[in-house]
Amino acid sequence: MTFYLSGFRSIPKLWKSNPYFELGPATSSTPFFLCAIGNQQRWFSVKPTTPPNSKALNLLDTKARTHRKGNDNNGQVSSDPHYFAAGAAKKRSHIGANPQNQGHALPVRSSVQLPTKPLNSAEWDKLKEDFKGKASFEDFIISQMARNCCSVDVAKSLLAWVAAKNNGIVGYNLLVKYLYLCVFHKQTSEVIDVYEIMKAKYKSLESGGYTLLIRGLIHSDRWRESLLLLEDIKKVMVPSKKNYGDCIQGALLHQDVNTAWNLYQELIGHNLIPPLETLKAFFDYGKDINDDHYSDKLLDILLYLRNNQLYPGESFAHSIKTWFESIPGRQWKGQFTTIQKSGQCSGCGRTIEPIHLSPEEYEFLKEKIMRDVIDGGDQYKKTTPQELKRFESFVNSCPPFDIVIDGLNVAKMFPKGRESQNLLGVVSQLAQQNLQLLVLGRKHMLRPSSQWRKEEMEQVRKQAHCFFADNISEDDPFLLYATLNSGNHCKFITKDLLRDHKACLPDARTQRLFFKWQQGHQLAIMKGFQKSKLTFQHILSYDTVVQRTGDSWHIPYDEDLVQRSSCEVPTKWLCLQRKTPDPC
């Protein structure tokens, strides 16, 4: 699509030179817009050739130092975080990485260097003449500019050159990428100029264009027009949580609280998870008002975080603390702390909710797992119904197990040892404790080879119940069935974090119960395991969710520089205590 610059506001006004606003943090703005637009067209596929800004470099350098410090302690068993601690998976992946493969990535080079200042027509002609790429020069340059968040003035000089060469015509793609830069640099007046052109030329836009305009308009006195754009999106699809989040923040910025809450309820009604920065905005706004109804809604947000096992970031946690401490007459006091292994808060001494499921929760989860995971069907095409039936009969013929072992997984935990020897070492030590053991394996483990000694596997079978599935079968359905069928006391050993099984559960409550059960039942062998002594990492005794106990709140939060996977939980907490009771 194309449009003519002439006819829509004067060219001098459109390309006026304004000093742009202070650059926002690249880590928050860039990924959002590239993802939002990338779903429509692959506009931002070219990798940057210029260095990232110094703030980003400093952040990456800090992260690198943090990881190096964490890896220096890998030999110390006492310093290991628990298996589900935030950042633990990242550390394990670093440990398992091959250092010979690191540092050999080839830099991506383009045939032109992005300009750092606006160019005139002759300079753009020369740059295009030097361009050797197969792609369109104009598309390549504007994509590079968007990826590197270049100056709006430089991008403006590109579009002015294109317009001069094409009788005032600039392609839609160039315009939208220019809009991206205007939004990123918070050039509100430029956003409005582009908005006027698009509104006059097009009856509707693709979702990426709407997303950019909404985010760009919310900071202006024309922010309500972002709500009209949201309505345009609703005509063809459910707006994204980012679209809703931006409109909510616009309403709060302009003190329209009712609109903000209405949009929030609409977002929740679509079963969308609100962006955490949107929830943070509600707390930031709340510290300036004294309204019990508003306060109740903020407490509902905390319960929403609990029910959906969501964790605020560090900045959000500070906003929550500030809001609590700003409530007049309540004398809330917050502190950032940790939870001891016993489950006691290091700040206030209160005991956090236990990780163990109640009998009712356990039976509910067991029924769901049996129905949606074990008998789910399609996601386990490699496991036949006949084999599952054979396994069920086998389990029912055995006494309840104390520990279920993923045999192949455990055998491969220690690369220096023979696999059958590794498995035998673990089984032998557990058997000495008179535990009922089940080893799950594959049939190839029974065929003698350099890794699987016949005599060692015979010793395994003497000390534990064993079930060997077909070589193409999935292990996990068997492991889950045997563990849950044996009762709430039964634990299991595997390095697999069972992400896929959690994901296939039907609702947030079941997924949360599954993760809670997993944290309380999955045993992780220490990295420093010696064949003569088997040691497990401690299992968390407490549940890592937002929780309220009388006159206190405990809120786990994500640290800024810790990369947490979806199967991990934060290790830092916000502890809030109230010195005076609620008024009657």
UniProtKB/Swiss-Prot annotation:
Q: Where is the transit peptide?
A: 1-43
Gene3D superfamilies in UniProt:
3.40.50.11980, Tetratricopeptide repeat domain
Compartments annotated for it: namely:
Mitochondrion
State which tissues express it: Detected, after the onset of hearing, in the organ of Corti around the afferent and efferent synapses of the inner hair cells and the efferent synapses of the outer hair cells.
Q: How is it modified after translation?
A: Degraded by LONP1 following mitochondrial unfolded protein response, probably leading to inhibit translation in mitochondrion.
- Alphabetically list the UniProt keywords: Hydrolase, Magnesium, Manganese, Metal-binding, Mitochondrion, Nuclease, Transit peptide, tRNA processing, Zinc
Enzyme superclass (EC):
hydrolase
Which cofactors, if any, are listed as required?
Mg(2+); Mn(2+)
Every PRORP domain range: 339-575
Q: Which residues form the signal peptide?
A: none
User: Is Magnesium tagged as a keyword?
Assistant: yes
Q: Name one Pfam family in it.
A: PRORP
Quickly give the catalysed reaction: Endonucleolytic cleavage of RNA, removing 5'-extranucleotides from tRNA precursor
Gene Ontology, cellular component aspect:
mitochondrial nucleoid; mitochondrial ribonuclease P complex; mitochondrion; nucleoplasm
Q: Which PANTHER family match?
A: MITOCHONDRIAL RIBONUCLEASE P CATALYTIC SUBUNIT, PTHR13547
What's this chain's function? Catalytic ribonuclease component of mitochondrial ribonuclease P, a complex composed of TRMT10C/MRPP1, HSD17B10/MRPP2 and PRORP, which cleaves tRNA molecules in their 5'-ends. The presence of TRMT10C/MRPP1, HSD17B10/MRPP2 is required to catalyze tRNA molecules in their 5'-ends.
Q: How does it assemble?
A: Catalytic component of mitochondrial ribonuclease P, a complex composed of TRMT10C/MRPP1, HSD17B10/MRPP2 and PRORP/MRPP3.
Q: What is this protein called?
A: Mitochondrial ribonuclease P catalytic subunit
**Native source organism of the sequence:** Mus musculus (Mouse)
Name the gene that codes for it: Prorp
